[in-house]
């Protein structure tokens, strides 16, 4: 199963980072290709994502489920769509009173025919999406930090 992980720090208290990261609509709008997030309940949501691979693109519904949420520590989730399974964990570590380290780990897997070949493609796409998503999150958090009094 292809995996990607990115770690970065932001100059914000952990409580501010946590508050932002648990807002699925706010975070969802930063995910590359996300066209909207529908909150179903405290643990479940549907993310409409436009996936592109070369000249082909398709909008899919990813059904996301929060498996575990420990305040100011971690969020564990899974998301599925037909033959696509993803899972991830976001961990938060207090570096200082005003700085937080965020680690984003994601795994993706395609089921069905030609799984091995599809996983090769998914591995590349996962890296691209992860870098874009974490860059957008870091920029938004840094903007938030610069806007605080």
What residues fall within each predicted segment?
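Hydrophobic pocket/interface hotspot
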Residues: 17-21, 27, 45-47, 66, ...
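Hydrophobic ligand-binding cavity/cleft-lining segments
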Residues: 1-44
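Extended beta-strand/beta-hairpin segments
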Residues: 3-4, 50-51, 94-101, 105-107, ...
């Amino acid at each position: 199963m292809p995996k990607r992980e990115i770690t970065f720090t932001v100059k914000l208290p952990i409580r501010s980072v946590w508050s932002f990261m648990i807002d699925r609509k706010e975070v969802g709008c930063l995910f590359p290709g996300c066209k909207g997030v529908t909150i179903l309940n405290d643990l479940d949501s549907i993310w409409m994502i436009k996936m592109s691979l070369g000249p082909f693109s398709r909008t899919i519904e990813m059904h996301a489920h929060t498996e575990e949420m420990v305040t100011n520590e971690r969020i564990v989730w899974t998301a599925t769509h037909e033959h696509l399974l993803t899972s991830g964990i976001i961990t938060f570590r207090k570096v200082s009173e005003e700085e937080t380290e965020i680690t984003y780990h994601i795994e993706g897997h395609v089921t069905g025919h030609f799984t091995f070949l599809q996983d090769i493609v998914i591995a590349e796409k996962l890296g691209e999406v992860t870098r874009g998503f974490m860059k957008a999150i870091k920029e938004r958090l840094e903007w938030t930090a610069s806007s605080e009094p």
